[in-house]
């Protein structure tokens, strides 16, 4: 048990309510604010004040507005913010972008909640393997991404279903 504790300490993996419930959740809120909420604000400003560049569609294959693009990146922004709060090394941090995107895509209404759980799991697993091999530049992103996207595939849809059911139950009160 001493070896496990020493390894976790060396990797800065701390299992605590403060780390996950306050630090990670607070960072997630910042990621959400800097993406979804700012995107909504930009869209509203563009619509209400007829600011063309804020309402103009950009992109040919998938047309978005600036605010729409910003909102669309809420999953990656939240996951990266969570990784930052957990003091994840750079290769883990950058790999969390795909993890956050997968959570939001697969989680529907529960995407943000799925991001919280999955990003914590993926970040801690990525931290555990980081700098343990000579091919760290491959191992760390692969482990972080596969664990994160795999976990998202398993738990994000049920979280989304539960979030939708909860939302519908509130409507019918």
Regions flagged by a language model, labelled:
Residues 55, 167-169:
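Membrane-interface interhelical loops and short amphipathic "cap" helices
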Residues 51-53, 153-158:
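Short, charged low-complexity intrinsically disordered segments located at boundaries
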